[in-house]
Design a protein with these regions (language model features):
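P-type ATPase nucleotide-binding
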Residues: 477, 481-608, 620, 632-648
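Flexible metal-binding regulatory segments at protein termini and peripheral loops
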Residues: 1-153, 165, 251, 276-277, ...
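Conserved ATP-binding TGD loop and adjacent catalytic N/P-domain core of P-type ATPases
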Residues: 19, 35, 459, 538-540, ...
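Membrane-embedded alpha-helical bundles of multi-pass transporters
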Residues: 137-153, 181, 200, 439, ...
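Conserved cytosolic catalytic loops of P-type ATPases
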Residues: 46-54, 58-63, 67, 228-230, ...
Length: 880
């Protein structure tokens, strides 16, 4: 299902356009609540996907507008006993600000409200507890509360102290009994039932005391004076409120990472309009506005530098610790800090389109989604409360039937009700997901969904696209070997000629000459020679620049230089030879060099038990050279862009759990096919739809970090779920008195309430440990390949070629880049021409990539293939 702008998404089934909306839900207190809300909305006609987040009190619904409306969704939630409203999204405010006001402030408000409730509850609970328990502790009490003659004063005063506590915490009763009446009890129902049972029994005790006085039965007065239970009811309510206060405080910290990011967003911007500078709110910045950013200021929005130079700190968004130098033409990201310098910029993305806003949106969507690991907790939550109520009733009846007192049996029933904690089940997963995704965002790792976060931890194969992922993605000059005319002279002649070419290798040579401030010479009669190189007259002298084939075609020899070129080619570099007036004057090697951290990252992934595979369109020789440098386990060479998805599928069919890492340019099908698609080096383009995880930096170490983070989060979730299940599995039997006959082990209701409160606090606090997650990066040396015999390089589709080689002859597959094709007629002409060449087994021509893939035997030469294409009226640019 693909998201589209303005909250719509396309459902692949029939192309139905679904609307996606976020709702604020009120009244939820535990997993049973979120489960009921989810079921109530999911059964509405037209509802496609419903995800309720207990931690954020939010709900995301994808639905068919032709069958369902937002009003009907809200009505369904209200019918279930809860409140709902569309999540406020001010049109003028960017998503970051919306998330800030909607998420962080909501958590702060909840914490503030709970603090007030707790403070007011304590004002009455402390004297109530002192009065009821003081005489047993030997604490001094006023004379009016001492002795049986003051039993009625003693009891009624406790009742009066309890009433404010009940009123302050009335929400438990309102929600608890309402959901109980609707046959969907939740945690509030357990609290309401437990405390109400204690209150009713206490009122019954007051009546029994009164009757005892009327009948002068002091034994009855004494008995019921000790069985009031008002302090249990009041203390239960206060302890649970205390736990919820601590929980609310902890919940507020789960979004600290995103809150810190949003705090970076500047509130104002300096804009230049009609030559006049003025300071305006950042919300009023429009596309195309010219903005001024001074040293120490935050960049207001995303844009491009027009003039000036600067050093920009992007660490908060990308995790890049070293400030990045910026000059005219460079892009800048909103909310980054201008550490030094002064520059003018043009706004290219404003409001909800800025990188910061999209980061917040992605994290918000991830925390609103559900991980598959939470399904068991969801199933248990749906039946948990009714089962607990049933256990409490059975336990109370059982102890009464075995001859125990009403007081004993009632304390058992109340303990079962108040110790049970469905809340811990509901918080186990979302707290860890929220903290984990927030921590990832701080490190420049944007995880789009809880499912992606969970799947990443089980990945056992990582497939890396070579260009732009393992390597820099841009050719640079690595070696300059002159044949006697001097390095600068060779580079000057080469750059002068190459400047007229648009080939990426030419650009690398020109850039090297410019970096060294060399002189560019005049060039005449420039000409491109397809499949060989270029030629022209440099200051009157004929200059040739190209591959070895070009030198041989022009009978230019220099065995020493040619041998050096072959050695450089063995290292994965591309040697370009230069000749002046028929004499070889030198060679320049160009390569797409490996990023500094690629080998370290691949070593880390291997140490985690993950197989690393590299996909590349390069030939086997170049692929093997890269493999030796970085230590990948296996290489699949000569892969066309459109075949990457097929290679991923082949790995999956072999039982692998695959993560694909690519730069997102031509990797979309492969990213979508993989179990986890990781787009690397996305920069400001954080909305790559095909990827599950977006890495802001172009650094493979972040892939290792993402896997480590995923494993840490899933481990934390498992710890939380274990605690939630273990706590209830042990606590409920103890509270029910299962161990009382053998060990005299019995749970006091107040202790049960305390345990329940701290169970939820424990789960949230455990999740908060993820705030200190830090990836472990080791400087381990990469694995090395000492000889070709242990090579892990394979040719794409080699398994297909082998099956066609029935007679045992050696077949090869070659890829021809062709210019001049414009339609399917062209494709047919080229395919027929190539198929007619003797020795060609199969020819496939692709218009989109402007290439042909041919399967040939050893007798077919490149010249024959080139001639066939040229004779058909097209141009074979290269053959590999």
């Amino acid at each position: 299902m693909k998201n589209t702008p303005h909250g719509y998404c396309i459902c692949p089934e029939g192309g139905i356009k679904l609307k996606k909306e976020t709702y604020d839900v009120t009244g939820m207190s535990c997993a049973a609540c979120s489960s009921r809300v989810e079921k109530a909305v999911a059964k509405q006609p037209g509802a496609q996907q419903v995800a309720v987040n207990l931690l954020k009190n939010s709900m995301v619904v994808e639905y068919d507008e032709s069958q369902l409306s937002s009003a009907q969704i809200i009505a369904a939630v209200e019918k279930a006993g809860y409140g709902a409203s569309l999540h406020a999204k001010p049109g003028s405010a960017p998503a970051a600000q919306t998330a800030e006001t909607g998420g962080a402030s909501a958590a702060q408000k909840a914490y503030s409200d709970m603090k007030k409730r707790l403070a007011l509850s304590l004002i009455f609970t402390i004297p109530l507890f002192y009065l009821s328990m003081g005489h047993m502790m030997g604490w001094p009490l006023p004379a009016c509360f001492l002795g049986m003659e003051n039993a009625m004063t003693f009891a009624f005063t406790q009742f009066l102290l309890l009433l404010p506590i009940v009123y302050i915490n009335r929400q438990y009763y309102i929600v608890g009994f309402k959901t109980l009446w609707q046959r969907s009890p939740n945690m509030d129902s357990l609290i309401a039932l437990g405390s109400s049972a204690a209150i009713v029994y206490g009122i019954y005790a007051i009546y029994k005391i009164g009757i005892g006085f009327g009948q002068m039965d002091m034994d009855t007065v004494h008995t019921y004076m000790m069985e009031l239970y008002f302090e249990s009811a009041g203390t239960i309510l206060t302890l649970i409120t205390m736990g919820k206060t601590m929980e609310a405080r902890a919940k507020g910290k789960t979004s600290d990472a995103i809150t810190k990011l949003m705090d970076l967003a500047p509130k104002t911007a300096t804009v230049e309009r009609n030559g006049v500078e003025s300071v305006i709110p950042v919300e009023e910045v429009q596309l195309g506005d010219v903005l001024i950013v001074k040293a120490g200021e935050s960049v207001p929005v995303d844009g491009v530098v027009l003039e000036g130079t600067s050093s920009v700190d992007e660490s908060a968004l990308t995790g890049e610790s070293i400030p990045v130098e910026k000059q005219a033409g460079d892009s800048v990201i909103g909310a980054t800090i201008n550490k030094s310098g002064y520059f003018k910029m043009r706004a290219t993305k404003v409001g909800d389109d800025t990188a910061l806003s999209q980061i917040v949106r992605l994290v918000d969507e991830a925390t609103s989604s559900k991980a598959p690991i939470a399904k068991l907790a969801d199933k248990v939550s749906g039946v948990f409360v009714p089962v607990v109520i049933t256990i409490a009733v059975i336990a109370t009846a059982a102890w009464l039937l075995t001859g125990h007192s009403v007081e004993f049996a009632l304390s058992i029933g109340i303990s079962v009700l108040v110790i049970s904690c469905p809340c811990a089940l509901g918080l186990a997963t979302p707290t860890a997901i929220m903290v984990g995704t927030g921590r990832g965002a701080v490190n420049g790792i944007l995880i789009k969904s809880a499912e992606a976060l969970e799947t990443t931890h089980s990945v056992n194969t990582v497939v890396l696209d070579k260009t732009g992922t393992i390597t820099q993605g841009k050719p640079v000059v690595t070696d300059v070997v002159d044949g006697g005319i001097g390095r600068d002279k060779l580079l000057s002649v080469a750059a002068s000629l190459e400047k007229l070419s648009e080939h990426p290798l030419s650009e690398a040579i020109v850039a090297e000459a410019e970096k060294e401030s060399l002189t560019f010479l005049s060039v005449d009669k420039f000409e491109q020679i397809p499949g060989q190189g270029i030629r022209g007259e440099v200051e009157g002298q004929l200059c040739l620049a190209g591959n070895r084939r070009m030198m041989e075609a022009n009978r230019i020899e220099n065995s020493e230089l040619l041998a050096q070129g072959e050695a450089l080619a063995e290292d994965g570099k591309t040697p370009l030879y230069f000749a002046l007036d028929g004499k070889l004057i030198g060679l320049i090697a160009v390569a797409d060099i490996v990023k500094p951290t690629s080998a370290q990252a691949i070593a880390e992934l291997s140490n985690m038990g993950i197989e690393v595979v590299m996909l590349t369109g390069d030939n086997a020789k170049t692929a093997e050279a890269i493999r030796r440098q970085v230590g990948v386990d296996r290489v699949v060479a000569e892969v066309l862009p459109q075949d990457k998805e097929r290679e991923i599928r082949r790995l999956q069919e072999g039982g692998k759990k695959v993560a694909m890492v690519g730069d997102g340019i031509n990797d979309a099908p492969a990213l979508a096919r993989a179990d986890v698609g990781i787009a690397i080096g996305a920069g400001t383009d954080v909305a790559i739809e095909s990827a599950d995880i977006v890495l802001m930096r172009s650094d493979l170490l972040d892939v290792s970090t993402a896997v480590q983070l995923s494993r840490a989060v899933i481990r934390n979730i498992k710890e939380n779920l274990f605690w939630a299940f273990f706590y209830n599995a042990i606590g409920i039997p103890i509270a029910a008195g299962v161990f009382y006959p053998a060990f005299q082990l019995k749970m006091n209701p107040m202790l049960g309430a305390l345990a329940m409160s701290f169970s939820s606090v424990f789960v949230v606090s455990n999740a908060l440990r993820l705030r200190w997650f830090k990836a472990k990066h080791t400087a381990a040396a990469p694995k090395t390949v000492s000889s070709p015999s242990d090579s892990g390089v394979e040719i794409a589709n080699s398994h297909t070629m082998a099956s066609n080689n029935e007679k045992g002859e050696t077949n090869m597959e070659k890829v021809i880049s062709i210019e001049g094709m414009a339609c399917m007629h062209c494709v047919n002409h080229v395919q027929q021409a190539l198929s007619a060449v003797p020795g060609v087994k199969e020819a496939k021509v692709d218009l989109e990539s402007k290439s042909a893939t041919v399967s040939v035997d050893g007798s077919v030469t490149d010249a024959a293939l080139k001639a066939a294409v040229d004779e058909a009226g097209y141009q074979a640019v290269s053959i590999r």
